[in-house]
Amino acid sequence: MNMRTLNLLCLLILSGVVVDPSLAEAVNTMRLNLPENASPVVKNIGQVMARQIQERCDAKIETTGEAKLMIEMVIEQGIGKEGFRIEDRKGGGVRIVGNDERGLVAGTGKFLRTSRYDRGGFTPGTWRGISIPTRQARGIYFATHFHNFYHEAPVEEIQHYVEDLALWGLNELVVWYDAHHFNEFEDPEAVKFRKRLHEIMAAARRIGMDVSLLVIGNEAYGNSPADLRSAPGGGRGGYYPCAVCPSKPEGMKYILKLLGEQFDWAADLKPRSVWIWPYDQGGCGCAKCKPWGSKGFMKCVEEVGKLARQKMPGTKILLSTWLMDKAELASVMEQLGERKDLVDGLVNEGNVLPAASGLGSVDQKPGDAAPVLTQDLPVVGFPEISMHNTFPWGGFGATPLTARAQGQWNAQKKGLIGGYPYSEGIYEDLTKIVYSQFYWNDQPAEETVKEYIAYEFSPDVVADVAAVVKTLEQNHHMRWWPGKLEGVPLEMNWFPSKNTKPQADPGAEEAYATMQKVDARLTHQAKNSWRWRQLYLRALLDSELKTNGGSPNDTCNEAFAELIRIYHAENAIGTIRPPLPKNWKKK
């Protein structure tokens, strides 16, 4: 044992953290012991641990025989719901104890994150202690549409990503079957998509997570009957003309048939809840439905909620207040006060209409209005982490908005029991993880950023990469250059970055230079991981675009092409496809 290692162990012991001295050295083989009669979820946790280690270093896990390191997984109640304990194992090694299956997966994640993978093998972490989540609603929403990553990537890749998120303590996956992409339930493309969605949700269940469904109040297929369609003028945000009017008797029948088929399809996964959504992309502007949020939409909430509970007994109904105005919110709360059985909770995020919700805004200042959400219903957040001040979404690589996330959380956490960040892809991976730790124990964003960098790249580069993350967030803004529209297909002729002027982007060249130096220090596995590549390419693009007057050169286009491959965005619509020029080919 070298002097540096000995000093570290002495410091840990003096701090009250007791460790097995043998754990300070890297190993290439280890043995995993699972409980007798381990459940399928526990067995899967072991498999996920093995995958994580083998992807990051040249080491492997065995379940029999001799090994240099013993890792034991057990479940023992008494720690606290979904909590865990990591301790030394009698006879040597590490013992990961979960209060339950979710506690075990979270504890496994903590052990993996505090270990090292860059010293010629696996160096087990020395963190010891107990951790219990302070909030039970710790989820993520995948926007499974527009041919984004969740819509197009190989299913196994997405399943692994779900497992990655579970290791950070997330316990629920919410998805949306966006019907406007298809023509009917038996549309071959719809059948294929539902199979894919089911496999993704099944992966969440296998790792101990719940699943939930998001539905539009007046959901419709792309070929909905013209005579049943909604009147224009009732939508806010995204809107498609195929939406159906629920005030027409046949329109409500159409909606319930569509959603009933969906509930039957998902019933075997036992969805924990159904979220019913008002705007973006629902709505109807007819006299019987206006104002949509408090009138037509509430008809849908009653009938769709009743159907969901009938088809999937035990499921909870959550009402979304997304894009409702203050008058609509007040009316909805009054109706919920009169009908206590209508819903089981609310989905609300103060960054949409902070003055209306009373939950605060994203500028770190609490909302000054008296809260309108007054019916003693649990409220979960829905922070938007994908689209803020950028276009195309994820078009320039990683978008770490960790300081903004801290501001969102500070302003709204007192009114929330947890939340579900809104995700359009993997480019905001770091921001997702920051939110996972807000929900777990209110850990500050800066601490989570350090933990993420140490785990995904190396503990030795934490300070350098954390500084780059700050620079990237500081220089996060819309971009535009002449001719950008050529070859970029858009829906609804929408291009929010149009005519944006180049900005100063201070520190962009230095950040890229730092990333180049760090790249040379990383293991082969770390430097070729998608998490590193998207962060590296973002720094490259910021630097190149700054020095090139804001317009892309061939170096930028090569970066765009690589991002398209990482995100499987070859068929994505222009809002989420990196802006590679039409017919560009590498020289």
Where are the language model's segments positioned?
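Catalytic-core regions of glycoside hydrolase
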Residues: Y117-G120, H145, N171, D178, ...
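Solvent-exposed, acidic/flexible segments
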Residues: P35-G46, E101-L104, H151-I158, A190-R194, ...
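N-terminal small/glycine-rich loop or linker at the start of catalytic domains
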Residues: R128-F149, S230, G235-Y240
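Catalytic domains of carbohydrate-active enzymes, especially glycoside hydrolases
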Residues: E156-D178
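Positively charged n-region of N-terminal signal peptides that target proteins for export
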Residues: M1-N7
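Bacterial N-terminal signal peptides
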Residues: N7-V17
